[in-house]
């Protein structure tokens, strides 16, 4: 209905940012990505991001931004309430009353126009006769039940109108029904984007992930000869995918692979390098997942380091700076500093707030592992400081690290040190490793020349 309210930030994200200190607030503001994200999101998808910001920014400005965002939608009751809040008034202008009446009348009209076809699509005996061939389906419905192309298109119009009213569940169903029957490729593509947004806004993450694949396939086929169109549509898909990326655990691996695929990592580097923040957060937190020691994770980390190094001149924030400090510059003090800043940025980011603790935990492990690899004798107090822990916490951390990673090390509690046993690599083994690397590079060059 017209009175519907978009889903809240709490509904779409599984955490909330605490009120930061002044320094933390400055860091959060400096690296706020909202202005960069908005151009790539539908206005309904922007709403929860604005609501999330209401705890961090000026409340009046946020209310005004919500009003400007939604005033052209059909959510008339909610928009009217925003107007009253902005103007500190209990009364609303006649234009809101008039628009509400128009919206309700239009809803009634669409419902009547689509009544016949929606009833048919709910009839199991009719649905049982439908096949994967849309042309055959439309012919069957036309001959047996008098369905016209106009009736099918009414599902599309009704679905879009329901979406504009904030009735996302109804919109998803209507757009799905339209897509089953329509042969209009442009409208089908539009309906797929609409259904994707509707599934996001109803937090139907499994259904949303199905739409990710459908949108991706549509981009590859419909825009095959339009590189600029592909770039723009892939950019939108990347941004919209952030919703399931950090709210639906099974989506994490699928979307990480998608973002690292050649077409999409090229899109990120070309059009939206700020997405590296989200890719970095995903890869770092993936360390805590089941495949943390697998070749898949190691490849993701290597790819991330490569892209962060390449794009450092174009985009950086404390999350990407942490990667650079640890794996490019091997600067542990800088890595510790950037980890502290990254924590504040994560807590102020709508998509990443719920991953903050996991990120910090995983990042500390990565610092420890890297530090232990290049030092023979490690001062527990020094390493604890680098991890942002006191000595007792650091000692427990190191004990757990040795146990979990099964490294060959022993703790000298009297001296307060950890002694790492790094077995020397034979010259023979070093030659083998270097030969493997040279052979791989030769294969890559040969493949490139062959193209």
UniProtKB/Swiss-Prot annotation:
Q: Where is the PCI domain?
A: 256-425
Main location as per UniProt: cytoplasm
What are the disulfide bonds? none
Does the entry feature the keyword Cytoplasm, yes or no?
Answer: yes
Compartments where located:
Cytoplasm
- InterPro entries of this UniProt entry? eIF3e (IPR016650), eIF3e_N (IPR019010), PCI_dom (IPR000717), WH_DNA-bd_sf (IPR036390)
Q: An example Gene Ontology cellular component term from the record?
A: eukaryotic translation initiation factor 3 complex
Provide the alphabetized UniProt keywords: Cytoplasm, Initiation factor, Protein biosynthesis
In the record, biological process GO terms are: formation of cytoplasmic translation initiation complex; translational initiation
Task: Provide the residue span(s) of the region labelled Disordered.
Answer: 1-21
Q: Could you cite one Gene Ontology molecular function of this protein?
A: translation initiation factor activity
Biased composition of type Polar residues is found at 10-21
In terms of SMART domains, this protein maps to: eIF3_N (SM01186), PINT (SM00088)
Assembly, per entry: Component of the eukaryotic translation initiation factor 3 (eIF-3) complex.
Please report which protein family the annotation says this sequence is part of: Belongs to the eIF-3 subunit E family.
The task this protein performs is described as:
Component of the eukaryotic translation initiation factor 3 (eIF-3) complex, which is involved in protein synthesis of a specialized repertoire of mRNAs and, together with other initiation factors, stimulates binding of mRNA and methionyl-tRNAi to the 40S ribosome. The eIF-3 complex specifically targets and initiates translation of a subset of mRNAs involved in cell proliferation.
What is the protein named?
Eukaryotic translation initiation factor 3 subunit E
Record the organism: Aspergillus fumigatus (strain ATCC MYA-4609 / CBS 101355 / FGSC A1100 / Af293)
Taxonomy of the source species: Eukaryota, Fungi, Dikarya, Ascomycota, Pezizomycotina
């Amino acid at each position: 209905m017209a009175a519907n309210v978009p889903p809240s930030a709490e509904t779409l994200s599984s955490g909330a940012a605490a009120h930061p200190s002044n320094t933390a607030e400055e860091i959060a503001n400096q690296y706020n990505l909202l202005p960069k994200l908005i151009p790539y999101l539908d206005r309904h998808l922007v709403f929860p991001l604005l609501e999330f910001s209401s705890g961090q920014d000026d409340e009046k400005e946020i209310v005004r931004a919500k009003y400007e965002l939604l005033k052209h939608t059909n959510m008339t009751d909610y928009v009217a309430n925003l107007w009253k809040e902005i103007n500190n008034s209990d009364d609303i202008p006649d234009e809101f009353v008039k628009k509400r009446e128009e919206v309700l009348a239009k809803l009634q009209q669409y419902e009547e126009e689509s009544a016949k076809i929606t009833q048919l699509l709910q009839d199991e005996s009719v649905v049982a006769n439908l096949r994967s061939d849309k042309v055959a389906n439309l012919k069957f419905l036309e001959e047996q039940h008098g369905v016209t192309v106009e009736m099918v298109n009414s599902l599309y119009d009704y679905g879009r109108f329901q979406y504009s009213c904030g009735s996302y569940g109804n919109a998803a169903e209507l757009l799905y029904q339209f897509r089953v029957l329509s042969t209009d490729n442009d409208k089908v593509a539009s309906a797929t984007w609409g259904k994707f947004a509707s599934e996001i806004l109803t937090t139907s993450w499994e259904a949303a992930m199905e739409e990710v694949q459908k949108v991706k396939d549509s981009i590859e086929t419909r825009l095959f000869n339009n590189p600029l169109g592909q770039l723009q549509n892939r950019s939108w898909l990347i941004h919209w995918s952030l919703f399931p990326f950090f709210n639906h655990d099974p989506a994490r691996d699928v979307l990480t692979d998608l973002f690292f695929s050649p077409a999409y990592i090229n899109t990120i580097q070309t059009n939206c390098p700020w997405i590296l923040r989200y890719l970095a957060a995903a890869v770092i937190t993936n360390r805590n997942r089941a495949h943390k020691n697998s070749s898949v994770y190691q490849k993701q980390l290597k790819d991330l380091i490569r892209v962060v190094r390449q794009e450092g001149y174009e985009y950086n924030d404390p999350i990407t700076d942490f990667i650079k400090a640890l794996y490019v510059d091997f600067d542990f003090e800088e890595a510790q500093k950037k980890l502290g800043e990254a924590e504040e940025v994560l807590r102020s980011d709508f998509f990443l707030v719920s991953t903050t603790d996991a990120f910090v935990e995983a990042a500390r492990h990565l610092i420890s592992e890297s530090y232990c690899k290049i030092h023979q004798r490690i001062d527990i107090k020094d390493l604890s400081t680098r991890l942002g822990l006191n000595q007792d916490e650091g000692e427990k951390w190191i004990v757990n690290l040795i146990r979990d990673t099964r490294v060959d090390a022993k703790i000298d509690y009297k001296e307060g040190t950890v002694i790492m046993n790094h077995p020397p690599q034979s010259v023979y083994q070093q030659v083998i490793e270097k030969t493997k690397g040279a052979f791989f590079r030769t294969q890559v060059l040969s493949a490139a020349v062959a193209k």
